[in-house]
Amino acid sequence: MNAPPGSGDAAASALEAASQAEASEVEASEAEAASAVEAASAVGAGGAVQPAVAASVADRARAAELARELDEHAYRYYVLDSPTVSDAEYDRLMRELTALEEHHPELRTPDSPTQKVAGSYSTLFTPVEHLERLLSLDNVFDDDEFHLWAARAARETEVDGWLCELKIDGLAVDLVYEEGRLVRAATRGDGRTGEDITPNIRTLASVPTRLRGASVPELLEVRGEVFFPTEKFAELNASLVAGGGKPFANPRNAAAGSLRQKDPRVTATRPLDMIVHGLGAQRGFDAASQSAAYARFAEFGLPVSTHFEVLASVGDVLAFIHRWGRARHDVEHEIDGVVVKVDAFALQRRLGSTSKAPRWAVAFKYPPEEVTTKLRDIRVNVGRTGRVTPFGELEPVLVAGSTVGLATLHNVDEVGRKGVLIGDTVVLRKAGDVIPEIVGPVVDLRDGTERAFVMPTHCPECGTELVRPEGEVDIRCPNTDACPAQLRELIFHLASRNALDIDGLGYETAIALLEADRVGDIGDIFHLTPESFEGLRGFGQKKIDQILRGVEAARHRPLWRLLVGLSIRHVGPTAARALARELRSLDAIAAAPAEQLAAVEGVGPKIASAVVDWFADARHRDIVARIAAGGASLADAGAAEGPRPLDGVAVVITGTLDGWSRDSATEAVQGRGGKVTGSVSKKTAFVVVGADPGAAKYDKARSLGVPVLDEAGFAVLLERGADAARERAVAADAPAAPAAPDTSGGQGAPDVDSARRAQRAQRAQDDAPPG
């Protein structure tokens, strides 16, 4: 049997606005080899290859240079656990070399990085031979490349099931069990030889030292990925820096470094975990497919992922890939793509492998969320509450679809914990819509010119001496009355999409109004007139009308949005919605004692104290009075009425709803007394599922037996209430066990209900591979 391979090798609003310029062009560093890479974009995915031509001297030199670079980067990644380039840069170099070799086959040698399983084994541990070789995976990077790969596989054999699983970004490990007893654990190494880490693996709570059950195989070699939980990563680095140690660049390096400790007792202190996803040598183990093997692994007590499915069509596979691309941060470990495998072992054997990778599996790589770049400087930004936030000025770099030149460092303590110096090469992370963040330095690239950041002692905007309130991590400017930065940020925040969403009142408008003394605080916004803009450059009648219409609309926004716009410390959308839902008017909130506010679900003592303190300030009460005098509503409609139809009903919304934005759907629920939460729990009354729902939320609803509503059911919930909605909900009869593989080797691990399949059926018809 062929061995299946492993699955994977705020700040302030001004900073956010400046740091996320959308980029449509390719970076200059990548454009250098664009023509060669484009010609080979189908390599590894079944694409046609251009006719070979003789290699020039420059081509030969470039190929040799690329081979040397790739070998060095692989050594630093797999052996030293200390990479100096990002995964994205490594992939780019590999694709360039692959392209050159496809154009000029004479450049391809047996020892080329394109022909080898990446990695080597360290000399720090005893080398051991794997019973069966661990192969790498070919990569595809978009739908077209995946279609080409799938079509090639389907031409060679009739594929009746594609197993899709998350590609864990961790350290590949090989486990050997004899008569059910763990006898050896080794790293991947070069695929043939790894390093013996058995004592260290035994410290992982998730890895059984003896397999469960009476019918364990005589011999079982399994492959998997050891990972470091993302939520624990920052905590580890902080402790390392505090002790004078070297921080890890990312969770993958933390996993590798923790597992390769000479003293297993150190490994035992790290919260490592593992997922098994592959089969090597075996005797006495019977399974017809990958999914059936996973079911057996689970019976033996081996850790297997619940986040996989066996799907019938390429359309369904791509839907899985893109769904998890949106939900990649909903799992406990980092993922950088999805691995797709032909499920049946017989078909895997028929398709075979190259010297490097199986033909029956491929990794669909997501756009990189981590890259390396130079930290040019560290500066500070003053926010609307006076918080002074360090941020990094970077050499602009493309990450997650945006060109990023600025990134948050949160606070001065965080700069110290991360161990970053001005001039460092740093790892930059941008996850989805999250503000770009500097993860840590690449210490091995330091040349001695780097320097430490020194926090300023006075506000860079108004010159006031900065303070650090007792018990807080943030340093603040106490000049809340006159600091121009704070006033600017307060106005910009009030008008932002998360608050009153005032069309036309952006950052530049806020600056212009303040500098011309047309406004002095946020209360003045509701008293703007056409005369307020007289003499201001760039404000024509059309622009003025747009802003004034935006202010008029803001006067009638829901109460929670006004609460957010007031910039009360700690009061974000969640707490604001809870307070508005419970008390219904700003007067009631202002008059409520801290104990009453703290009793509101989702508020608590810290937020309650901040609200009481804010309204205790006479200047703030004057601002509220001026807002009211400007015609703004300080109460929600129906504030004097009794109970509402969805009082106490918790709803989770996932996917896209026709005719509803996420904000409008949320406000529809909250306006009827319900609340919308971000995660599914036993307290959730309904999960509303639109098109392309988040996999984790949907599966959690099924496992807990929470009623699921489609869009029509959501309409019933809003119009007729919870009881009527339950009658048309899709719900499990009883809470389901955690999703487990299908032992039949068929199409269902885990099951996908018929309504969800029907939504995708039409899309899948045009996507099915030939044959």
From Swiss-Prot:
Active site: 167
Main enzyme class: ligase
Record: residues binding Zn(2+): 459, 462, 477, 483
GO biological process: DNA repair; DNA replication
Sample GO molecular function, one term: metal ion binding
GO CC annotations on file: cytosol
Stretches with biased composition (Low complexity): 1-23, 731-742
InterPro entries per the UniProt record, alphabetical: BRCT_dom, BRCT_dom_sf, DisA/LigA_HHH, DNA_ligase, DNA_ligase_AS, DNA_ligase_CS, DNAligase_adenylation, DNAligase_N
Protein name: DNA ligase
Species of provenance: Frankia alni (strain DSM 45986 / CECT 9034 / ACN14a)
Gene name as annotated: ligA
